[in-house]
Amino acid sequence: MRSLTLAALLLCSLLLVFHTSAAAELEAQEGHLMIPGDTDTALETVDDERFFECTFECDIKKEGKPCKPKGCKCKDKDNKDHKKCSGGWRCKLKLCLKF
């Protein structure tokens, strides 16, 4: 039992050393570590706005279909009231979700 515990500790130590050295190498190559929130802030804001817009304006009847505004039964796409939630938004689980 002791040998199994010792082997597990040794393996974890090696993985930690490998991970640390790989991170240091990437930092040296890039000059800095990339922080995910830095570049996605503008896109995240647009996605949040689109999510709320779609959630409140959509009449969800069929799963997987494009989200459509409530009360719009016309097929005239030139009508300004006939908006679609575009950009990958679909009705799933009674919500408009981006895919």
Swiss-Prot record:
Signal sequence, renumbered to the chain: 1-23
Disulphide bonds in the chain: 54-67, 58-91, 72-74, 85-96
SUPFAM superfamilies found in the cross-reference section: omega toxin-like (SSF57059)
Membrane spanning residue stretches: none
GO terms for MF: toxin activity
Propeptide span(s): 24-50
Any matching Pfam family: Toxin_20
Location(s) in or outside the cell: Secreted
Keywords: Disulfide bond, Neurotoxin, Secreted, Signal, Toxin
One Gene Ontology cellular component annotation held by this UniProt entry: extracellular region
Expression by tissue: Expressed by the venom gland.
Major place of residence: secreted
Superkingdom of the organism of origin: Eukaryota
InterPro entries linked: Hwtx-2-like
Further remark: The primary structure of the mature peptide is identical to that of U1-theraphotoxin-Lp1a (Lasiotoxin-1) from Lasiodora parahybana (AC P0CC18) and U-theraphotoxin-Lk2a from Lasiodora klugi (AC P0DRD8).
The protein's role, per its UniProt record: Toxin that causes irreversible contractile paralysis into adult Aedes aegypti resulting in 100% mortality after 24 hours.
Family classification: Belongs to the neurotoxin 12 (Hwtx-2) family. 04 (lasiotoxin) subfamily.
Protein name: U1-theraphotoxin-Lsp1a
Native source organism of the sequence: Lasiodora sp. (strain IBSP 8539)
